[in-house]
């Protein structure tokens, strides 16, 4: 976390600054696309975004970190401990864990609904016991907590030009779209963890099943039925992106370049998956560095342009107020009104 970002956000307590810095590190290490897009936000909003994503990454590590040997029971107890700390922190108690401290501070600053955090942890707990989903409807209930609430948490930080309730469905859809893309990109790794986030009904519609996916993963052999499933899942994912897209224009202008950049980069992962023949069971699809750089540069240009316009408008308002205050007033009466020639 840069000193400039923390100062701009009004975060001065040394322990709290260290907590936000910890969240920034988690986001930088685990979420390169999100981290890159976050740099396009105004500096005063970046710490809050890092706190939200840092918490999500930390909880996800408890569930999924294969480098840390732990039984499902140990992971479940760790999540329960995290939830207890979270509840205490949101009530105003000083949390021992820095990530919780930063998250609680962000939730208070932006009046974020606490249910979004408890819903998220509920979905994280289900990952310890649930390895698959029968339908998109069933998967959707899981994704409300694992993805949709992330978009809803972000709305107060990003700001909107419409009522927040109007923008909320699109923000939730974007969170879901991003996670559906993750599911497709990481389908092989998730299988290794004993999970498959492609509904059973989708597999059956194309003559496939979980056993076939596991066979292909273990042997490295392609299968046309698996390709058909993945192609259909990508089409579904694109439909969710389309549902989310109108929400970008509902955000505060200074936040749009960040979210548009994340939108383009993440939907670009689908393009990479398609270009690689849907071989996600055998290798990870990535957006080429040159493409990432071009998208980031476009986002930076947009961000600078928006901030320049906003700064000029603010300067014009300040100048108008200064002129009003300096205008001579008649004794005991209002300032004279300037009449324009007709």
From Swiss-Prot:
One of its GO terms (molecular function) is squalene synthase [NAD(P)H] activity. It is an enzyme of class 2 (transferase). ATP is required for the transferase activity but it does not seem to be hydrolyzed during the reaction. GO terms for biological process: carotenoid biosynthetic process. Keywords: Carotenoid biosynthesis, Magnesium, Manganese, Metal-binding, Transferase. Its EC number is 2.5.1.-. Residues 321-342 are annotated as: Disordered. Pathway: Carotenoid biosynthesis; phytoene biosynthesis. Its cofactor is ATP; Mn(2+); Mg(2+). Transmembrane segments: none annotated. SUPFAM superfamilies: Terpenoid synthases (SSF48576). PANTHER family: BIFUNCTIONAL LYCOPENE CYCLASE/PHYTOENE SYNTHASE. Belongs to the phytoene/squalene synthase family. Involved in the biosynthesis of carotenoids. Catalyzes the condensation of two molecules of geranylgeranyl diphosphate (GGPP) to give prephytoene diphosphate (PPPP) and the subsequent rearrangement of the cyclopropylcarbinyl intermediate to yield phytoene. This is Phytoene synthase. It comes from Streptomyces griseus. The lineage of its organism: Bacteria, Bacillati, Actinomycetota, Actinomycetes, Kitasatosporales.
């Amino acid at each position: 976390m840069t000193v400039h970002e923390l100062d701009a956000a009004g975060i001065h307590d040394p322990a709290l600054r260290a907590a936000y810095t910890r969240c920034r590190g988690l986001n930088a290490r685990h979420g390169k696309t999100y981290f890159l897009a976050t740099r396009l936000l105004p500096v005063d909003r970046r710490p809050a975004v890092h706190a939200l994503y840092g918490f999500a990454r930390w909880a996800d590590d408890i569930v999924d970190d294969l480098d840390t040997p732990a039984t499902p029971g140990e992971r479940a107890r760790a999540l329960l401990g995290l939830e207890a700390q979270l509840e205490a922190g949101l009530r105003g108690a000083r949390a021992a864990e820095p990530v919780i401290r930063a998250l609680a501070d962000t939730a208070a600053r932006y009046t974020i609904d606490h249910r979004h955090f408890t819903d998220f942890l509920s979905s994280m707990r289900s990952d310890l016991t649930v390895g698959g989903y029968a339908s998109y409807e069933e998967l959707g209930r899981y994704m409300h907590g694992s993805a949709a609430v992330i978009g809803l948490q972000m709305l107060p930080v990003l700001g909107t030009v419409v009522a927040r309730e109007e923008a909320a469905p699109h923000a939730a859809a974007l969170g879901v779209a991003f996670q559906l893309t993750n599911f497709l990109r990481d389908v092989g790794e998730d299988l290794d963890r004993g999970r498959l986030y492609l509904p059973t009904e989708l597999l059956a519609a194309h003559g496939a099943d979980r056993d076939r996916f596991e066979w292909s993963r273990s042997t490295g052999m392609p299968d046309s039925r698996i390709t058909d499933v993945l192609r259909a899942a990508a089409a579904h994912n694109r439909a969710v992106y389309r549902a989310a897209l109108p929400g970008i224009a509902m955000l505060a202008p200074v936040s749009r370049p960040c979210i548009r950049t994340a939108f383009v980069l993440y939907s670009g992962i689908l393009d990479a998956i398609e270009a690689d023949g849907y071989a996600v069971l055998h290798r990870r699809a990535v957006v080429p560095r040159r493409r990432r750089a071009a998208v980031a540069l476009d986002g930076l240009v947009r961000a600078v342009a928006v901030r320049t316009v906003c700064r000029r408008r603010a300067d014009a308002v300040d100048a108008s107020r200064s002129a009003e205050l300096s205008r001579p007033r008649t004794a005991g009466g209002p300032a004279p009104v300037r009449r324009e020639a007709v």
